């Protein structure tokens, strides 16, 4: 299956002013699928963290925003040696304490890393405990399959 949104991800990857990217969208529109498909297609390595499924990592940002410590923890949890050629996916980021705020520090202290985050629109919007990293992240809205994407997915042309 091919989503037209993947072209936006390629532009993000190649941007000289790349910021952490938050992929927003309603539940079940394919945010996780799109990020993982893009990782397989465009990166040699992917460190995927789902904060909804990993109780321990939900507290990754509780004490500080030390990027080296964070990257080491992600590497240990995922089994991936994280470097600047790795796509770091932080899924269901609204479940991590101070997770959205942490994206600011990737932009300020480690812009060489490729970081994507995702969460439901409602979950991100209602996450009151975080200070929002205005100007430090980019956003991409993902919508359900278009009619043409659906036709392509089921192998039809018309």
Please name every model-derived segment:
Residues 1-158:
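Phosphate-binding site recognition
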């Amino acid at each position: 299956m091919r989503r037209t949104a993947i072209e936006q991800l390629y532009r993000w990857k190649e941007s000289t002013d790349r910021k952490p990217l938050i992929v927003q969208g309603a539940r079940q529109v394919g945010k996780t699928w799109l990020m993982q498909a893009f990782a397989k297609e465009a990166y040699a390595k992917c460190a995927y963290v789902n904060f909804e499924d990993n109780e321990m990592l939900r507290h990754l940002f509780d004490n500080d925003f030390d990027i080296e410590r964070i990257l080491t923890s992600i590497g240990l949890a995922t089994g991936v040696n994280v470097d600047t050629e790795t796509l770091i996916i932080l899924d269901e980021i609204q479940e991590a304490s101070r997770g959205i705020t942490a994206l600011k520090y990737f932009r300020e202290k480690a812009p060489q890393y490729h970081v994507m985050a995702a969460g439901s629109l409602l979950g991100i919007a209602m996450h009151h405990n975080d200070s929002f990293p205005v100007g430090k992240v980019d956003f991409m809205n993902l919508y359900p399959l278009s009619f043409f994407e659906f036709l392509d997915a089921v192998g039809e042309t018309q």
